[in-house]
Swiss-Prot record:
Its cofactor is pyruvate. GO terms for molecular function: adenosylmethionine decarboxylase activity. Is synthesized initially as an inactive proenzyme. Formation of the active enzyme involves a self-maturation process in which the active site pyruvoyl group is generated from an internal serine residue via an autocatalytic post-translational modification. Two non-identical subunits are generated from the proenzyme in this reaction, and the pyruvate is formed at the N-terminus of the alpha chain, which is derived from the carboxyl end of the proenzyme. Keywords: Autocatalytic cleavage, Decarboxylase, Lyase, Polyamine biosynthesis, Pyruvate, S-adenosyl-L-methionine, Schiff base, Spermidine biosynthesis, Zymogen. Belongs to the prokaryotic AdoMetDC family. Type 1 subfamily. Its EC number is 4.1.1.50. PANTHER family: S-ADENOSYLMETHIONINE DECARBOXYLASE PROENZYME (PTHR33866:SF2). GO terms for biological process: spermidine biosynthetic process. This is S-adenosylmethionine decarboxylase proenzyme. Heterotetramer of two alpha and two beta chains arranged as a dimer of alpha/beta heterodimers. It is an enzyme of class 4 (lyase). InterPro entries: AdoMetDC_C, AdoMetDC_fam_prok, AdoMetDC_N, S-AdoMet_deCO2ase_core, S-AdoMet_deCOase_pro-enz.
Length: 124
């Protein structure tokens, strides 16, 4: 069965707290990770929380990358969802793990849009 997309749910631990609490740097690294994976970036939106933490999304032509950070725990929750064959979501996850100076990353890949029977696409 072919899937429409691949969705990586990554748990990134032991990260540099200063990086995880820097909105501008998180945005830069997230955009770089999308490009590293071969994606085409469309939009970005990031928010810095008080007293700490950053959440954000990078919208790509192929879907999205999202992040939520807990600097006080050295932890980042990351989603990388890509459609098509051009972009490798694992490249983005590995890039993020390296740039966050993480000690450990675990991840699960979920196939999205898996149809057991042929689907007729409607003309819209």
């Amino acid at each position: 069965m072919n899937a429409l997309g691949r969705h990586i749910l990554a748990e990134i631990y032991g990260c540099d707290a200063a990086i995880l609490n820097n909105r501008n740097l998180i945005e830069k690294i997230m955009v770089e990770s999308a490009l590293e994976a071969g994606a085409e970036v469309r939009e970005v939106a990031f928010h810095k929380f008080s007293p700490q933490g950053v959440s954000g999304v990078v919208v790509i032509s192929e879907s999205h990358l999202a992040i939520h950070t807990w600097p006080e725990l050295g932890y980042a929750a990351v989603d990388v969802f890509t459609c098509g064959e051009k972009v490798n979501p694992w490249d983005a996850c590995n890039y993020l793990t390296e740039r966050f100076k993480a000690k450990h990353m675990t991840a699960t890949e979920v196939k999205r849009g898996v149809f057991e029977e042929p689907v007729k696409v409607a003309n819209l």
